[in-house]
Curated annotation (Swiss-Prot):
PANTHER family listed in its UniProt record: SULFITE REDUCTASE [NADPH] SUBUNIT BETA (PTHR11493:SF47), SULFITE REDUCTASE [NADPH] SUBUNIT BETA-RELATED (PTHR11493)
Cofactor note: Binds 1 siroheme per subunit. Binds 1 [4Fe-4S] cluster per subunit.
Residues noted as binding [4Fe-4S] cluster in the record, renumbered to the chain: C437, C443, C482, C486
Organism expressing this protein natively: Bacillus licheniformis (strain ATCC 14580 / DSM 13 / JCM 2505 / CCUG 7422 / NBRC 12200 / NCIMB 9375 / NCTC 10341 / NRRL NRS-1264 / Gibson 46)
Assembly and binders: Alpha(8)-beta(8). The alpha component is a flavoprotein, the beta component is a hemoprotein.
Name of the protein in its database record: Sulfite reductase [NADPH] hemoprotein beta-component
Phylogenetic placement of the source organism: Bacteria, Bacillati, Bacillota, Bacilli, Bacillales
């Protein structure tokens, strides 16, 4: 196909494009806004820029109406997200994050579905101190949000530790090498002096340019048989290919993404498609050139159609592949065979190479805090004080106390026991396979509860599960407070998307290994109807399933929902 069809959609640039253009490479008036003493918030333009620095301005929506009555501004606060490729933290970094959450945040840490930390409830006056403390722990928040490449994920379960280590190094290299080059972050938060003069755009941002990307860009690397990072949900996914215990390269998959807009069929979740294979040393080149295609041809006019998945679907998979190979100057090899078995975590102790041990722990909703009857945050703090390995955050909002020496295993096991930290074995497998986004009260986009509500809903679903002998049956269940899809709802065998307070669209039929999207089953229903539907479907699954048949496969075979064969027919 000729180059004549390679163009971005026409239309005036969105307001965010104007903000980026006028921002002097993400500086804007952020420095001044953060010093403004009369408001705990910042201007809308600066908030759009703030994302690229790893933060969103939010307010406590539980307090919104009361504050309006009192004629007060909203209870503004900031969410801060750390850039932590592959979800790997040292015990020392864990202790710093723990302390900052208690000192400046709301006393909790959120483990995200992209393997990093979020802190909520930080006041404007404490932001700079918090970011500087994170920096002193050899971490940062650069590009954790915004129209750039986000936190690079990789499979965290350390069964193949040597392979995992290599894959982690590649994810770290990608994350570091694809960072924006502007010094705005260092000047605003770390008091670096601005260099005088006006350098050329290609000096400041050789890859991104002055407008950065049309929308966020997500990369993840999976190591089969685990698809815990949901590689097909990424804008750019890499699937590690291992032969004779050696990493020989990666299959390349492009064009995934979960977000959509209620009522707009031109928006939809989509799965990345495998287009070929590259060697490890070609990985960065493939990533960089793919990003530049999105930079040049993505939609800068309509933000809800600006993700790379829409660029791929609009131009055509083959066209994008050809353009990628054009820019690379070489062709991708043919994709290699691979096999995924699941996209969940494997819990409990497992022994890796070199006599090291790893404990995968269930953290419901990814929320690390101290409850009245469960001192989770304190327990993890005490473990971090004695642990000499690392701590890995998983894409399912759990964590792994990893690389534990045989000498330390006894002490760490005692602390796990003392604080009741759990591998989730006494819960149903469905609860262990659940994830939820933050939603209310802090997320400004949420239309309904998610993290605060899903555990209570599962309490009731568990009764149906246990009555039907399904306690040990892994069924992935995911809930998001809005259609943006942070908890990857469209890849849950049972998925819920918030529509209004207490109301959800219910989806069924995603694949257990993350290779098929779900289909809407019921629209705008509340708890009573959700439970009524599951009281009908789960007993049927228990009685009628074939041996080894997964719930997501069963509901399609039984005709309960149609199969979604591609994101473009998600709404059919």
């Amino acid at each position: 196909m000729g180059n004549e069809i390679l163009k971005a959609p026409e239309g005036p640039p969105s307001d965010v494009e104007r903000i980026k253009k006028e921002s002097d490479y993400l500086r804007g008036t952020l420095k001044e806004s953060m010093l403004e003493p009369l408001s705990a918030g910042i201007s809308d333009d600066d908030n759009r820029l703030m994302k690229h620095h790893g933060s969103y301005l939010q307010d406590d929506r539980d307090l919104r109406n009361e504050r309006q009555k009192q004629k007060l501004e909203p209870a503004y606060q900031f969410m801060l997200r750390v850039r932590m490729p592959g979800g790997v933290a040292t015990p020392e970094q864990w202790l710093v994050m723990d302390e900052l959450a208690r000192k400046y945040g709301n006393g909790t840490l959120k483990l995200t579905t992209r393997e990093t930390f979020q802190m909520h409830g930080i006041l404007k006056w404490n932001m700079k101190k918090t970011i500087q403390s994170i920096h002193s722990a050899m971490l940062d928040t650069i590009a954790a949000c915004g129209d750039v490449n986000r936190n690079v994920m990789c499979t965290s379960n350390p069964y193949q530790s040597e392979i995992h280590r290599e894959v982690y190094e590649w994810s770290k290299k990608l994350s570091d090498d694809l960072l924006p080059r502007t010094r705005a972050y260092h000047e605003i938060w770390l008091d670096e002096e601005k260099v005088a003069g006006t350098p050329d755009a290609d000096e400041v941002e050789p890859m991104y340019g002055p407008l950065y990307l049309p929308r966020k860009f997500k990369i993840g690397i999976a190591v089969p048989p685990s698809n815990d990072i949901d590689v097909f949900s990424q804008d750019l996914g890499f699937i590690a290919i291992v032969e004779d215990d050696k990493l020989i390269g990666f299959n390349v998959a492009i064009g995934g993404g979960m977000g959509m807009t209620h009522g707009d069929k031109a928006t939809y979740p989509q799965l990345a498609k495998v287009i070929g294979f590259c060697k490890p040393e070609q990985l960065y080149d493939v990533a960089e050139k793919t990003i530049t295609i999105q930079r040049d041809y993505g939609n800068r006019s309509v933000r809800k159609n600006a993700r790379f998945k829409y660029t791929v679907d609009r131009l055509g998979l083959e066209t994008v592949k050809n353009e990628l190979e054009n820019r690379l100057g070489w062709s991708l090899a043919e994709a290699k065979p691979y096999h995924f078995e699941h996209n969940g975590d494997r819990y409990g102790w497992v022994k890796g190479v070199k006599g090291r041990w790893h404990f995968t722990m269930f953290v419901e909703g990814g929320r690390v805090t101290d409850y009245d009857d469960y001192k989770l945050m304190t327990g993890l703090r005490e473990i971090a004080k004695v642990h000499t390995g690392d701590i890995r955050l998983t894409a399912n909002q759990n964590l792994i106390i990893a690389n534990v020496t045989s000498q330390k295993k006894k002490k760490i096991s005692e602390l796990i026991e003392q604080f009741g930290l759990t591998d989730g074995k006494h819960y149903t497998a469905l609860r262990r396979s659940s994830i939820a986004c933050v939603a209310l009260p802090t997320c400004g986009l949420a239309m309904a509860e998610a993290e605060r509500y899903l555990p209570k809903l599962i309490d009731k679903i568990d009764e149906i599960v246990e009555e039907n002998g399904l306690k040990n049956e892994e069924i992935t269940i995911r809930m998001t407070g809005c259609p943006n899809g942070c908890a990857r709802h469209a890849l849950g065998e049972i998925g819920f998307i918030g529509k209004a307070p207490g109301k959800y669209n219910m989806y069924l039929g995603a694949a257990f290994d993350g290779s098929r999207l779900s289909k809407m089953y019921r629209e705008n229903i509340g708890e009573e109807e959700i439970l009524k539907e599951l009281r009908n479907i789960l007993p049927r699954y228990a009685k009628e399933r074939n041996e080894g048949e997964r719930f997501g496969d069963f509901v399609i075979r039984a005709g309960i929902v149609k199969e979604t064969t591609d994101g473009t027919n998600f709404h059919d």
